[in-house]
Amino acid sequence: MVSKTPSTSSDEANATADERCRKGKVPKRINKAVRERLKREHLNELFIELADTLELNQQNSGKASILCEATRFLKDVFGQIESLRKEHASLLSESSYVTTEKNELKEETSVLETEISKLQNEIEARANQSKPDLNTSPAPEYHHHHYQQQHPERVSQFPGLPIFQGPGFQQSATTLHPPATVLVLPIQPDPQTQDISEMTQAQQPLMFNSSNVSKPCPRYASAADSWSSRLLGERLKASE
C-alpha cells in the first residue's frame, strides 16, 4: 500500500503537466484569426468615434461615407488654414506700415515742437521789445495829439498839414507860410502864359489840401502859339 501511493501521485502530476502544456500551445491559424478579429473591432471603434466627431446620420454610417466626409472636412480645414496664413501675412504687412507711419508721425511731431518753441521764443522777444521804456520820451504822435488839444486854432488854419512837436520835430505851425507865386504879365496877353498863370492859380489852393487833386486837361497847339516866334523874327530884321 505504501509503494502504490507515490506512483499514483506521480501519475497525477504528469497528467496535470500535460494538460497545462496542451492549453499553452495555441495553433497558428487560431491565433491569426483572433488577431484579425481584434484589429477589425479596433477599426470599427475608430470609425464609430470618427462618425461621432463628424456628427453623421445613422443612415450614412458606412465606412465609405465616413471616409468621404472626413476627406471633405480635412479639405475645408486646409482651406481655412491657407486663408488664415494669407490674413496673417497681410496683418504683418499692415503692422509694418503702421510702424513706419508711427515713426514718421513722431518725426513730424518733433519738428512741430521745435517750430513751436522757436515761435514762442520769437513772440517773447517781440513782447520784450514792445514793452514801453519809462526812461525815454513819448512818441511824436503823443505830442501831436497834445498840441492839437492845446492849440486848436492853429490846427484849423492848416487842416491838410501834419504838426509834429517833439525832440525830433521842432517845427511849429506858425513858421509854415504858403509859397509865393510869381506871375509874368506881358504887354499883350499871351494865351500860353495866360494858361500857365491860370494853372498856377488853380494849383495854389491844392498845395494846402492834397485831397482835391484833379487831372490837368490836355492842351493842343493853336495859331496863337507862334506869336512869340514871329515877334523875335521881326526884331531881328529891324536890328539888321
Swiss-Prot record:
Any GO CC annotation of this UniProt entry: nucleus
GO biological process, one term: regulation of DNA-templated transcription
Primary location: nucleus
Tagged with keyword Transcription regulation: yes
InterPro entries: bHLH_dom (IPR011598), HLH_DNA-bd_sf (IPR036638)
Molecular function terms, GO-annotated: DNA binding; DNA-binding transcription factor activity; protein dimerization activity
Subcellular location: Nucleus
Complex formation: Homodimer. Forms heterodimer with PYEL proteins bHLH115, bHLH104 and ILR3.
Name the UniProt record assigns to this protein: Transcription factor bHLH47
Native source organism of the sequence: Arabidopsis thaliana
Gene: BHLH47
